Amino acid sequence: MARAKFERTKDHVNIGTIGHVDHGKTTLTAAITMTLAELGGAKARKYEDIDAAPEEKARGITINTAHVEYETDSRHYAHVDCPGHADYVKNMITGAAQMDGAILVVSAADGPMPQTREHILLAKQVGVPKLVVFLNKKDMVDDEELLELVELEVRELLSDYDFPGDDIPIVAGSALKAIEGEKEYKDAILELMKAVDDYIDTPEREVDKPFLMAVEDVFSITGRGTVATGRIERGKVKVGEEISIVGIKDTRKATVTGVEMFQKTLEEGMAGDNVGLLLRGIQKEDIERGMVLAKPGSITPHTEFEGEVYVLKKEEGGRHTPFFANYRPQFYVRTTDVTGTIKSYTADDGSAVEMVMPGDRIKMTVELINPIAIEQGMRFAIREGGRTIGAGVVSKILK
């Protein structure tokens, strides 16, 4: 049988399952593929196939993640599921699997548990825009009132973390019963997917966002000017446009007089392209690796931020010893290392933390020695002598 060509006619959305261990995330993932497979929208995947997730590396960290894909009438989905709690934490913080929305799985028999709370907090911190809830194991709850209580509890918990708890769609069902083929429960899976279709927004495409390119290298071409090279992270750039050069030194403007890719001249470069941009009115010494070229006004330089960070264990190549306030590692942002001082650490409940151990997840306040173009939701690595000792995401800009 010839392989079907991938038709990009439907909107593409990245989602994932999150929630407490053993509440049924992987079973639900399997149930979605099996239920949609009957409608021709997926390849059925068994629990065992999904659970045996391959290892992958993101920002120097090994993570186990399973990727499945399926489609509904209106959309094509890429869905991530992680076997272990630590994998979720690492995945969400590194952004290895970017999520446009997530399905929070809560066992109706147990209600919200510690990791339910932790995953909701993480979703908020790393910028997952919308959640839909699946109350699993409904077949194990005889009392309708109990089901309503769990639903209320979940809605309150979501509101605690600034998600719109009253508006979030909650669908009750049983992933296992759906896999076993019971109609009522297969219908609940379809109802869940309808909620995901309707409630989780289609993300803005990278190419439609404001232009940004991190500078990787700079050289001058005699008689023509200065060229900055790098990969366009988002948006597009045309010959003749004015751009800002942001970070390290004072922000300044320049005009793009040429866009080149693989020795060919282009009219415009777009997200994903590796290009050289010829800039007018800029000397080679005015621009360096670590700066970004961006649409004027779209990004600003900052020195102080809060980050949600996963600190590598020593088995993962991280530090062997704890660290404290005023620790000064390098923060690897986009294309460059910037030294910064970690001023303080905070636990999930807002209390101050004195000492951070390898393997911890922690919120930290960082002050960089140079202003860099950073924004909320941006990923970074923490390095010491060239090796990665942590991964983080900017949760809040302070100044």
UniProtKB/Swiss-Prot annotation:
Reactions catalysed: GTP + H2O = GDP + phosphate + H(+)
Coiled-coil regions listed in the entry: none
Coarse class of the protein's main subcellular location: cytoplasm
Annotated residues for binding of Mg(2+): 26
Gene Ontology cellular-component annotations: cytoplasm
Residues annotated as domain tr-type G: 10-204
InterPro entries noted in UniProt: EF-Tu_GTP-bd, EF-Tu_GTPase, EFTu-like_2, EFTU_2, G_TR_CS, P-loop_NTPase, Small_GTP-bd, T_Tr_GTP-bd_dom
Region (G1): 19-26
Region (G3): 81-84
Annotated EC: 3.6.5.3
Protein keywords: Cytoplasm, Elongation factor, GTP-binding, Hydrolase, Magnesium, Metal-binding, Nucleotide-binding, Protein biosynthesis
Record region (G4): 136-139
GO BP terms in the entry: translational elongation
Region annotation (G5) ranges: 174-176
Class of enzymatic activity (EC top level): hydrolase
UniProt keyword Cytoplasm present: yes
UniProt xrefs under CDD domains: EF_Tu, EFTU_II, EFTU_III
Pfam family, one: GTP_EFTU
Subcellular location: Cytoplasm
Protein transport is among the record's keywords: no
Positions that bind GTP: 19-26, 81-85, 136-139
Function: GTP hydrolase that promotes the GTP-dependent binding of aminoacyl-tRNA to the A-site of ribosomes during protein biosynthesis.
Subunit structure of this chain's protein: Monomer.
NCBIfam families: EF-Tu, PRK00049.1, PRK12735.1, PRK12736.1, small_GTP
Similarity remark: Belongs to the TRAFAC class translation factor GTPase superfamily. Classic translation factor GTPase family. EF-Tu/EF-1A subfamily.
Name of the protein described by the UniProt record: Elongation factor Tu
Species the sequence originates in: Synechocystis sp. (strain ATCC 27184 / PCC 6803 / Kazusa)
Taxonomic lineage: Bacteria, Bacillati, Cyanobacteriota, Cyanophyceae, Synechococcales
